[in-house]
């Protein structure tokens, strides 16, 4: 089992992508989050190659502010995209995905 800690406030799908002529495009905010996540993952993932085969992924989102109105289902896409080619080859390898959110924590983090 691999565990990662990303000390960033998650960016939702709605913040990360915007409509364009040819469909959806990643926003500047989304691109910055994805790059920062990828950097943290590269630091923590010590294997030479991405994982192969079927994967189970559990994600814990921690938020500081009680006033946060967070739809957990909007949080997965950008994070999983940032893991691609670092932790696994493609998110199609994930056969079980679970997530949890905690609000009122000491810091904004993703585990």
Which residue ranges define each predicted feature?
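Acidic, proline/glycine-enriched N-terminal capping motif
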Residues: 1-111
């Amino acid at each position: 089992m691999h565990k990662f800690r990303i000390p960033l406030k998650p960016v939702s799908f709605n913040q990360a992508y915007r409509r364009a002529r040819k469909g959806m495009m990643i926003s500047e905010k989304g691109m910055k989050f994805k790059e920062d996540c990828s950097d943290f993952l590269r630091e923590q993932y010590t294997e030479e190659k991405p994982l192969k085969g079927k994967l189970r992924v559990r994600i814990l989102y921690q938020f500081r502010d009680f006033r946060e109105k967070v739809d957990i289902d909007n949080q997965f896409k950008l994070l999983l995209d940032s893991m691609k080619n670092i932790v696994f080859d493609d998110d199609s390898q994930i056969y079980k995905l679970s997530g949890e959110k905690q609000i009122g924590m000491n810091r904004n983090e993703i585990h």
